[in-house]
Regions:
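Intrinsically disordered, Ser/Thr/Pro/Gly-rich linkers and terminal tails that flank
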Residues: 1-122, 163-208, 220, 230, ...
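Short, well-ordered strand-loop elements centered on a beta-strand within folded domains, enriched
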Residues: 126-135, 188-193, 273, 346-349, ...
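Conserved P-loop NTPase
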Residues: 336-341, 347-378
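A residue-level signal for beta-strand positions that form part of recognition/binding surfaces
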Residues: 115-117, 128, 178, 191, ...
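Cleft-lining beta-strand/loop regions that shape enzyme active-site pockets
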Residues: 2-5, 132, 141-143, 147, ...
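PDZ/PDZ-like domain segments forming the peptide/carboxylate-binding groove
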Residues: 16, 20, 44, 48, ...
Length: 406
């Protein structure tokens, strides 16, 4: 792209860009059309005309005095305006994605992508981008990345308080290329290099524990997760499962469609989750109860279990389908929708708050466990898991009780 421009060109294009943003967002691709019929900001304090006029003044001054005018990148300037518009809303979940970020975002829900094979989350206390899971035999594992690593830099990009989706877009890239990842581990800064590869996301793992208690771990709710979960559930049933543990610890969430379809394999007839938008309109997602799971069940959660994980745990808790074991979850009780902007970019916007079957809002609160147990690391036995032990004990107790009552 040619960056050098004639006098006044930058001012004209930027003013036009902002006017387009203020007049409305035309969202195509089968989503919805949003337009501004009021002609001003919702507050009524700042009009389009005032903003456009001030921007004209800023651009006139930049055109007249800015030393590096020939280096102005109008495309980057435009992207900055779009990003700034959403950032100024003060909602960390409403985000504008440029073309590269949109491509990476779409890949992240497909079940396969070119990357390093690690799951990231935002630490609930520090807001740092943190690795919570490293896929087995992945480039991330081969590079030495570990769960708990705090991301500081991706190549030359400072991570800081960047949106998680942006950080992920930096990590992903063409198969066979290297990415330099700088992490903080136990107070020590480490610079590691991973070679990107095609990652087939295994979001579900499972095994039969002692006393015929099935264990299913779900790392995230992607497009591929439903089939993997159903396969695990069916196989454990064939093995004679007497009770079940679903482990959602460190699961940051994912697709609403995926989690509700999974819950249809477990819940009785009724509401799975309901949402309420800005106008008070309520929508319900329901279950017909055809596949209700009636055996003892526990769901493991922690402070990193968020979004779709909280829909799952909140629903099974409300119906009494499972006991929730662990600590209070993250507390993300709002729904976002991806909206195609028609030019390879997209907008992720918060459109509703969701409620559990009993009408509970968990936004900013989280799902509280029925059996609270903090994870305790055992230096002598690093593989020990006191939270899992408690879940096993909880399910076993219910199995024993149901056997006695027969």
């Amino acid at each position: 792209m040619e960056q050098k421009k004639k006098k006044g060109y930058g001012a004209g294009i930027v003013t036009g860009i902002l006017a387009t943003v203020l007049v409305g967002l035309l969202l195509l691709g089968g989503f919805r059309v949003i337009t501004n019929t009021a002609g001003s900001y919702a507050s009524g304090k700042v009009t389009e005309k005032e903003v456009s006029k001030k921007l004209d003044k800023l651009n006139a001054l930049i055109d007249k005095y800015y030393l590096y005018e020939d280096e102005i990148d109008t495309e980057k300037l435009a992207e900055g305006i779009y990003s700034g518009y959403t950032s100024a809303l003060g909602d960390k979940y409403t985000v504008y994605y440029d073309e590269d970020e949109t491509k990476a975002l779409m890949e992240s829900t497909s079940g396969t992508f070119s990357g390093v094979g690690a799951t990231l989350t935002k630490d609930a206390d520090t807001d740092y981008a943190t690795i919570v899971n490293v896929y087995e035999d992945s480039p991330a594992e081969k590079a030495g990345l570990k769960a708990g690593d705090i991301l500081e830099k991706i190549d030359d990009h400072e991570v800081g308080d960047e949106q998680l989706d942006t950080v992920v877009s930096w990590i992903k890239g063409e198969k066979g290329t290297d990415v330099k990842i700088t992490v903080l581990r136990d107070g020590e800064e480490l610079e590691l290099t991973a070679t990107r590869d095609t990652i087939e996301v295994k979001t579900v793992s499972y095994e039969m524990k002692e006393n015929q208690i099935g264990y299913i771990r779900v790392s995230e709710f992607d497009t591929v997760t439903y089939d993997q979960f159903k396969e695990a559930l069916d196989d454990l049933e064939k093995q004679g499962m007497q009770g079940l543990i679903v482990d959602l610890r460190n699961n940051p969430g994912g697709s609403l469609d995926t989690v509700t379809n999974m819950l249809r394999l477990l819940l009785p007839e009724g509401t799975i989750v309901s949402t309420k938008d800005k106008n008070g309109k309520t929508d319900e997602i329901t279950c017909d109860g055809t596949h209700e799971f009636k055996k003892p069940m526990a769901v493991l959660v922690n402070q990193y279990s968020a979004s779709a994980s909280e829909i799952f745990s909140g629903a099974v808790q409300d119906y009494g389908t499972a006991k929730i074991v662990g600590v209070t979850t993250y507390g993300k009780g709002v729904v976002q929708q991806l909206m195609d902007l028609g030019d390879g970019t997209c907008l992720k916007v918060t459109i509703a708050e969701y409620y559990t079957p009993n009408g509970r809002s968990i936004n900013g609160k989280g799902v509280e466990p029925d059996v609270e147990v903090e994870y305790q690391y055992d230096e002598e036995n690093p593989k020990a898991d006191n939270q899992l032990d408690q879940a096993l004990s909880t399910v076993q107790g219910e199995i024993s009780e149901s056997t006695q009552n027969r």
